[in-house]
From Swiss-Prot:
UniProt-recorded name of the protein: Histidinol-phosphate aminotransferase
Cofactor: pyridoxal 5'-phosphate
UniProt-listed InterPro entries: Aminotransferase_I/II_large, HisP_aminotrans, HistidinolP_aminotransfase, PyrdxlP-dep_Trfase, PyrdxlP-dep_Trfase_major, PyrdxlP-dep_Trfase_small
Family note: Belongs to the class-II pyridoxal-phosphate-dependent aminotransferase family. Histidinol-phosphate aminotransferase subfamily.
Pathway(s): Amino-acid biosynthesis; L-histidine biosynthesis; L-histidine from 5-phospho-alpha-D-ribose 1-diphosphate: step 7/9
Residue(s) carrying N6-(pyridoxal phosphate)lysine: K221
GO molecular function: histidinol-phosphate transaminase activity; pyridoxal phosphate binding
Keywords linked to the UniProt accession: Amino-acid biosynthesis, Aminotransferase, Histidine biosynthesis, Pyridoxal phosphate, Transferase
Its EC number(s): 2.6.1.9
Catalysis performed (reactions): L-histidinol phosphate + 2-oxoglutarate = 3-(imidazol-4-yl)-2-oxopropyl phosphate + L-glutamate
Species in which this protein is naturally found: Paracoccus denitrificans (strain Pd 1222)
Length: 367
């Protein structure tokens, strides 16, 4: 660079962001790979959603609706929520980004737990805010630690419930206690995995009743639409109004809107996926425990397998790859001794349990 050229610096915080790495889907030299690294629904979207997207493709030359009225109406109908208090985005990631853009900034703080979703830190930095991480208690959100970690500068508190990658969760009374203890901040309940929990509204009732609670949800998990990128948020009208002012008018395509609406309305497909996930989640956790690999009780569509140390976990991951199985290392979440394993279909679960059993047996014999 010549002396006459200058480097134009980005906004504060941008260069603190580490590039996000999604779950791998290929292994060099290995065929018939089973991907269990991204918490995807192994059964994919419902047939009704597929059909709706095909129909919508005939209108790709038309701009989509800007108000997302059809999708918001379907969400409101299914969940018993006011559609006017719902905002839709490009995955729940975009909603998280909107919240940080609108309510955080230089000199403010964004609070989250040590094993929380990486997008909280990324979005805080993108807004120029200070990300603040607090400890968990045995891989479970510690409400007291969050309350103690809050300051007058705290503007947002993110709690994934259930949490990714631990799969653990806290009760709604605890979340309400947190919201009331830190009234100057918005408590964001990230309920991406809420559909995998029985008798749980993801924090919707709290977001209806309290002025500083906001809930985010996604179509990427149980709805099987990770490739479509659709999420939504629900909370006080005042917050939704603010977020809509920075939302791009055409952020969701016609295909995304129609596919997500049809997926939301197909409750039979969701019920089948819920039942199968619960069945195989329990089976896989027990099967791995019998092979000396424990895990916490998971409330999501994955389990967090714990090994003796980081070296053992890493070696197991490499062994799984040689057998065509891709799981997720979670050292970036502060859990280097763990592997996160998506609950796949029955064949995939049995296969990964068998291969991990082989690995553990071979490792024991080599000592």
């Amino acid at each position: 660079m010549s002396q006459n050229q200058t480097t134009i610096a980005p906004q504060p915080g941008i260069m603190e962001i580490s590039l996000y790495e999604g779950g791998a889907s290929k292994v060099a030299g290995v065929e018939n790979v089973v991907k269990l690294s991204s918490n995807e629904n192994p059964f994919g979207p419902s047939d009704k959603a597929r059909e709706a997207m095909i129909r919508a493709a005939h209108g790709l030359h038309r701009y989509p609706n800007t108000d997302h009225a059809g999708l918001r109406g379907a969400i409101g109908e299914v969940h018993g929520l006011d559609p006017d208090r719902i905002i839709c985005g490009v995955g729940s990631d975009e909603i998280i980004h909107f919240l940080c853009q609108a309510y955080a900034g230089p000199g403010t703080e964004v609070l989250f737990t040590e094993h929380g979703f990486l997008m909280y830190r990324i979005s805080a930095h993108a807004a120029g805010a200070i990300p603040v991480q607090v400890a968990e208690r045995d891989r479970v959100t510690d409400i007291d630690a969050l309350i103690a970690g809050a300051t007058p500068r705290t503007r947002l508190i993110f709690v994934a419930n259930p949490n990714n990658p631990t799969g653990t969760m806290v009760g709604l009374p605890e979340l309400e206690r947190l919201a009331r203890a830190v009234p100057q901040a918005i408590l964001v309940v990230d309920a991406a995995y809420a559909e995998y929990v029985g008798d749980y509204d993801g924090g919707a009732e709290l977001a209806t009743r309290l002025p500083n609670v906001f809930m985010t949800r996604t179509f990427s998990k149980i709805y099987g639409l990770g490739g479509l990128r659709v999420g939504w948020g629900y909370g006080p009208r005042e917050i939704v109004d603010v977020l809509n002012r920075i939302r791009g008018p055409f952020n969701l395509s016609n295909v995304a809107l129609e596919g997500a609406e049809a997926a939301m309305r197909d409750r039979e497909h969701i019920a089948r996926c819920q039942a199968e996930n619960a069945r195989m989640r329990a089976w896989l956790a027990e099967a791995l425990a019998e092979k000396g690999v424990p895990s916490d009780t998971s409330c999501a569509n994955f389990i967090l397998a714990r090994f003796a140390d980081a070296e053992t976990a890493g070696a197991c991951d490499e062994y799984l790859k040689t057998q065509g199985l891709i799981v997720r290392r979670v050292a970036g979440y502060g859990l280097p001794h763990c592997l996160r394993i998506t609950i796949g279909d029955e064949a995939s679960c049995r296969r990964v349990a068998h291969v991990i059993g082989q690995y553990m047996a071979e490792r024991a014999e080599s000592r």
